Amino acid sequence: MKVNYLHENETGYKVFLYIFYVCSFLMLSITAYGVYAMLQEWSVDGKYVMGEVLVKTEFPFPHFAKLTTWLFFATIIGWYCCSRIGWKRTVKLYTWKMALLQLMLLGLAVICLYEVLYNFMVLNAQITAGIIDGHVPDIDSLTIAYPDASRPWNLIFATKMFLAGFLISAHAFYLSTRPRKSVEDINP
């Protein structure tokens, strides 16, 4: 059975390319907004909570999706589109380059999985501690003062971003271990 890979002249390729452009625009605009808001908070208070503004901002209207959800979604969908349209760039990776890439992807997947589990456990512990103390905490405001107390991370933001990193690196590792396409597949 011959597998048909996407080529530039096919409609499917163009669909993936345009969706990738939309996802890239979403990622860049959300990141720019987050950096701007973080710098504003830093200039006023002298500290900031990484990702807090993205967790507390709902878009396009109240009680809809938060910016972290949009960023997570755009990152995952954008990566999938990139993996579908960018297969030609990986065809010529052989031997030591591919082995090095696979080791880096495996390492990144393990680190991201550890961070997801760690952040999720800390999040659950803080929720449980709040309930034991007699009040349900605002989940969107829970932070961890790691690695620096003056620059804590919002736990929802950290969990979603490291989950996206894990999914992308695990998928890339999976793709890198599949049977290789041949150079003849580049030009149909």
Task: Report each predicted region and the residues it spans.
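Hydrophobic core of alpha-helical transmembrane segments in multi-pass integral membrane proteins
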Residues: L28-S29, L71-Y80, L108, G165-H171
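Canonical alpha-helical transmembrane segments
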Residues: F59-V91
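Hydrophobic alpha-helical membrane-insertion segments
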Residues: I19-Y36, L101-V122
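Membrane-water interface of alpha-helical transmembrane segments
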Residues: H7-S24, K66, Y94-Q102
